[in-house]
């Protein structure tokens, strides 16, 4: 909470006490940690994974949606992210485990009669994973999109791809150029998406299946890749919740606005560099899928010490903004690297682990995973 916090959130002590958005003090998870050492903070930096399995993610053109625009088979969908790793030779670095502390994700749903419907699966991939986000065998980078009206691009089933060679990942600085380049991984503006040939089957299905208000929102951004900062006068006007405000924070189109494209009095950019299909910034497109896969069951009945890679748990007293406290449980997972669920592709050791990919699938209901730590040890 600060002077920048919208009034409707600042006064909503119930929401600020919700275990899946509240600040978490260091002492909740680490009660004996020394708070006096240099650089210490009073709250933990939490990795939050909010997954809404019935909602379309960016570039999801599945036509099987209901009248509200929700996917009709949520357990068959997935959501994930991937990152480069700075340490690649695990054997030399003596890295033997994936280790993390996770807050019980079923604090509220366990009180419901359909509690068993809230579980699913969490997967971790370590090794080589494809950087080709929109799979077409071509590297997309926003800064390659032309700003001079030239035709230095080609098309794939997803959209436009720049054809000029990569020199650097930096936006053009001429007036009006940002709107032409900060367009997301498909290289298309919203208006171009509305007319793009391979999107028409989806748009036809959406028009037939949804009500008018839902279709209007789909039509406004067919690829569903538009970015929205977590602050915004429109968010404030509708009194959006904390979780809702972050639903579009990772979308690529418009996430690096310049002053010409910012309608607020404050900076709304998520980043200042172009989105590229090159996670480790080596100017090449890695298309290999060679990795070890690890599986963790995220179900109430499987959160048991001694099973499912859980080695410890901690019941803590969580202070609440509305007053008082509630007991919550944190679980420590420690996954031996040698105990992978399966091996994909030609990988035989842990000497060149360049990427990590994590994803959730098999969920029927929304879920928020909160990680107090996430380490390779």
Model-assigned labels for residue ranges:
Residues 2-95, 101-377:
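Interaction/scaffold regions that mediate signaling and macromolecular assembly across diverse proteins
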């Amino acid at each position: 909470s600060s002077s920048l916090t919208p009034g409707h959130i600042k006064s909503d002590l119930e929401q600020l006490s919700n275990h899946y958005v509240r600040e978490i003090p260091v002492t909740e998870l680490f009660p004996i940690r020394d708070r006096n050492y240099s650089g210490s903070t009073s709250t933990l930096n939490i990795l939050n994974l909010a997954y809404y399995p019935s909602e379309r993610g960016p570039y999801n053109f599945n036509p099987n949606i209901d009248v509200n625009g929700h996917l009709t088979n949520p357990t068959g969908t997935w959501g994930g992210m991937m990152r480069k790793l700075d340490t690649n030779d695990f054997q030399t670095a003596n890295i033997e485990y994936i280790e993390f502390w996770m807050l019980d994700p079923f604090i509220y749903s366990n009180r419901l009669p359909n509690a068993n419907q809230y579980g699913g699966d969490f997967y971790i991939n370590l090794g080589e994973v494809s950087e080709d986000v929109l799979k077409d065998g071509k590297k997309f980078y926003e800064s390659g999109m032309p700003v001079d009206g030239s035709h230095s691009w080609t098309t794939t089933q997803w959209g436009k791809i720049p054809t000029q060679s990569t020199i650097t990942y930096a936006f053009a600085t001429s007036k009006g150029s940002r709107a032409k380049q900060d367009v997301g991984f498909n290289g298309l503006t919203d208006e171009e998406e509305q007319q793009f040939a391979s999107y028409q089957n989806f748009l036809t299905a959406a028009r037939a299946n949804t009500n008018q208000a839902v279709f209007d929102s789909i039509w406004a951004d067919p690829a569903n890749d538009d970015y929205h900062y977590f602050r915004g006068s429109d968010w404030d006007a509708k009194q959006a919740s904390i979780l809702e405000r972050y639903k579009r924070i990772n979308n690529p189109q418009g996430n690096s606005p310049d002053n010409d494209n910012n309608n607020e009095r404050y900076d709304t950019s998520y980043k200042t560099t172009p989105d590229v299909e090159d996670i480790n910034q080596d100017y090449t497109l890695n298309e290999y899928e060679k990795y070890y896969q690890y599986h963790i069951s995220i179900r109430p009945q499987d959160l048991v010490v001694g099973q499912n890679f859980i080695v410890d748990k901690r019941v803590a007293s969580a202070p609440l903004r509305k007053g008082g406290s509630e007991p919550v449980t944190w679980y420590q997972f420690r996954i031996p690297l040698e105990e992978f669920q399966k091996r994909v592709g030609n990988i035989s050791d842990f000497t060149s682990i360049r990427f990590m990919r994590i994803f959730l699938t098999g969920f029927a209901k929304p879920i928020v995973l909160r990680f107090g730590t996430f380490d390779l040890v």
